[in-house]
């Protein structure tokens, strides 16, 4: 993996295939001797409360890969959002996040019912936020109460911008201590957290990595639009109807990343085209 940032806009794709993000997670955890980190959710289900969450982690085999830390198990803390944020002043994250000196932010790029798509920025915002922090993001700063947020959701644009602002808080906190990897395989219009996701329609695209999460998400979005419309139409529609790409615009405006990038293939072959196919 190259570490040349090309003015923070360098993007390295890998045309290797991966069957699951868990496979990549296992390799990264073992080679780096790191922990897998997680936070409790803000919606009902087995991952909202720590005891049930730990059982879910065990049931899905993650304890066999590495130590799993639920970062908001014992406490949470606020970190400042970037200057220019319009909805959030502080992001509320799991307190154990501060225990780490470096981060591999591993994402399964796919669609998402609320965010349009889930990639690095969604993982940095919703994934790192505590239960109360997730409520804060979903409500665009109106409440930290997970029991109240779902009955009074803000305009979609405000939610998308709140995700960008929360992600910016985490990126600013990490500084240059992070690398971002997105696995584009089994692309459904729904998130992995959905109990009944729509079957994947897009074939594997590959694995992309960058030191810039905004560039990484932009490249993944571009590769969806460069794919055969017969298989990518549903995901395109999901991203557009949820205003998903707007997170890229707001993140770039906040100054912690850039949408410009260049693709470089690790095996020396010609990188895939990102020219839109209609």
Predicted regions mapped to residue ranges:
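Extended, low-polarity segments enriched in aliphatic/aromatic residues
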Residues: 2-3, 8-9, 15-20, 28-39, ...
């Amino acid at each position: 993996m190259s570490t040349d940032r090309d003015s923070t806009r360098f993007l390295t794709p890998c045309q290797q295939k991966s069957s699951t993000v868990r496979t990549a997670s296992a390799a990264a955890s073992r080679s780096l001797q790191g922990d897998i980190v997680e936070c409790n959710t803000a919606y009902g289900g087995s991952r909202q409360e720590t005891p049930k969450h730990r059982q879910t982690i065990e049931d899905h085999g993650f304890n066999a890969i590495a130590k799993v830390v639920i970062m908001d198990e014992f406490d949470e803390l606020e970190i400042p959002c970037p200057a220019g944020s319009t909805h959030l002043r502080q992001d509320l994250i799991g307190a154990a996040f501060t225990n780490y000196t470096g981060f591999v932010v591993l994402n399964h790029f796919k669609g998402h019912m609320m965010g349009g798509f889930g990639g690095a920025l969604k993982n940095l915002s919703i994934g790192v936020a505590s239960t109360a922090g997730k409520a804060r993001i979903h409500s665009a700063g109106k409440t930290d109460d997970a029991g109240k947020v779902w009955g009074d959701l803000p305009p979609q644009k405000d939610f998308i911008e709140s995700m960008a602002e929360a992600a910016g808080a985490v990126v600013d906190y990490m500084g240059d201590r992070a690398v971002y990897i997105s696995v584009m395989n089994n692309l459904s219009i729904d998130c992995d957290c959905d109990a009944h996701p729509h079957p994947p329609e897009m074939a594997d695209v590959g694995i992309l990595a960058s030191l810039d999460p905004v560039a990484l998400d932009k490249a993944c979005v571009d590769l969806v639009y460069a794919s055969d419309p017969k298989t990518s139409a549903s995901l395109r529609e999901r991203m557009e109807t949820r205003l998903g790409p707007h997170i890229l615009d707001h993140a770039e405006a906040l100054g912690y990343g850039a949408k410009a990038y260049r693709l470089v293939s690790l095996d020396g072959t010609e990188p895939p085209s990102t020219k839109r196919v209609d």
